[in-house]
């Protein structure tokens, strides 16, 4: 079933991509990444059941002693709007593969690409009836899903504020919650980095999908010897990136998801300028289309630097040495993704060891994901649980049982 589902994602990629453009404001290349990743998630999940899922345990008694993994029963999946297909299927596929039923609640704004399309693909792939249910809805629906006694594990991807509520509710009902939450990821550009490549990486990390990605590069930490040229190069790229409707024209950035999010972005940008930051590029919008924005001369307390913006905003802060870089990069409640750019890989890895982060990329920006890799953050970015990779998925969607077996009934003195 999962292999057939993977093939269907590939077969219907164009149709499903259109829905991602229409609902989520994706540019076609980003939509293509989502459908390709959905296929890969299904192919990877198809092999999960053949992985060794238990162990033989030594016992002082004359018996066989085993630790084995069993399905939890029903898994509740709550997925967001920004990458609606990837962030749903990465839990749905492995949960099904490991013998569970799934109840999926997509964001109402992306109910087709993050929910109904998934149900249709699995239906066409031959998934038995009743194993996957889709419940589009708002906060009330999510609360009901977490509280339902049939749901034993909750997989949630969304904001840190919402994740805290999900975690609290799950704890009250004594069920596991796997939380992948917000971030304010740093890209650290060391003094020996290739400037042109660094600027390109920084632009991609901050402006891809309008900055509406949990691991978006939200903070640019640049060595003081490169900072002026880095800001100029990043601002030039921002000024020339086309913004518009990806359903009608070829653009680099599409629309912000709604007016509420657009207004939050603009409020943080204007508050940052009021606090002394210099607007090097952008800072304006037309409807839901927000120009990619570069802020220079920021401080650690500048609003767009200190908070997760979830928009196409690149605040640039300078540092003088590695100690200052480590302190600045680690000076946040979040710990999702980190990028470090340097010609000296050993130096970059040593710096990475000093900065708490669930994901680290040496000589790359902060946005990356693969079906085979464990994904998740620390601190306010998550509970340390992981999505992706066989070990993480088995841990997330099964329970451990201790099983002993004897050939005859044990004799006792009573």
Regions of interest found by a model, annotated:
Residues 1-63:
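N-terminal Rossmann-like NAD(P)+-binding subdomain of aldehyde/semialdehyde dehydrogenases
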Residues 24, 134, 191, 258, ...:
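A structural signal for short, well-ordered beta-strand elements
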Residues 151, 188, 242, 269-270, ...:
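Conserved C-terminal structural/oligomerization subdomain of aldehyde/semialdehyde dehydrogenase
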Residues 161-299, 362, 409-413:
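ALDH superfamily catalytic-core signature
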């Amino acid at each position: 079933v999962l292999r057939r589902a993977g093939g269907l994602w590939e077969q219907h990629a164009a149709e499903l991509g259109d829905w991602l453009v229409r609902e989520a404001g994706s540019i076609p290349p980003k939509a293509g990444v989502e459908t390709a990743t959905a296929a890969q998630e299904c192919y990877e999940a198809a092999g999960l059941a053949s992985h060794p899922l238990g162990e033989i345990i030594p016992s002082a008694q004359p018996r066989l002693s085993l630790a084995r993994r069993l399905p939890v029963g029903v898994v509740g999946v709550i997925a967001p709007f920004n990458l609606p297909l990837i962030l749903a299927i990465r839990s749905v596929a492995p949960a099904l593969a490991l013998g569970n039923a799934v109840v999926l609640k997509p964001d109402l704004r992306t109910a087709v690409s993050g929910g109904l399309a998934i149900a249709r693909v699995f239906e066409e792939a031959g998934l038995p009836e009743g194993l996957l249910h889709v419940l589009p809805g708002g906060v009330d629906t999510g609360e009901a899903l977490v509280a339902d006694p049939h749901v034993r594990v909750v997989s949630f991807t969304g904001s840190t504020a919402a994740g805290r509520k999900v975690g609290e509710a799950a704890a009250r009902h004594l069920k596991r919650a796997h939380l992948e939450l917000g971030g304010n990821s740093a890209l650290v550009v060391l003094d020996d980095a290739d400037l042109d490549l660094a600027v390109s990486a920084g632009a991609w990390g901050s402006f891809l999908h309008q900055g509406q990605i949990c691991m978006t590069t939200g903070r640019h930490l640049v060595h003081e010897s490169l900072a002026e040229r880095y800001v100029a190069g990043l601002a030039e790229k921002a000024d020339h990136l086309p913004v518009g409707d990806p359903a009608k024209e070829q653009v680099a950035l599409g629309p912000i998801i709604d007016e509420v999010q657009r207004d939050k972005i603009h409020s943080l940008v204007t508050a940052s300028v009021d606090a002394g930051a210099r607007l090097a590029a952008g800072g304006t919008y037309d409807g839901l289309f927000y120009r990619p924005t570069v802020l220079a001369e920021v401080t650690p307390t500048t609003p767009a630097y200190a908070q997760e913006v979830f928009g196409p905003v690149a605040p640039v802060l300078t540092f003088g040495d590695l100690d200052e870089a480590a302190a600045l990069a680690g000076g946040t409640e979040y710990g999702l993704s980190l990028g470090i750019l340097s010609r000296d890989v050993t130096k970059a890895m040593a710096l990475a060891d000093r900065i708490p982060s669930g994901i680290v990329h040496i000589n790359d920006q902060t946005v990356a994901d693969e079906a085979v890799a464990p994904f998740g953050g620390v601190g306010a970015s998550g509970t340390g649980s992981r999505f992706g990779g066989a070990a993480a998925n088995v841990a997330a969607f099964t329970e451990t049982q201790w099983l002993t077996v004897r050939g005859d009934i044990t004799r006792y003195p009573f």
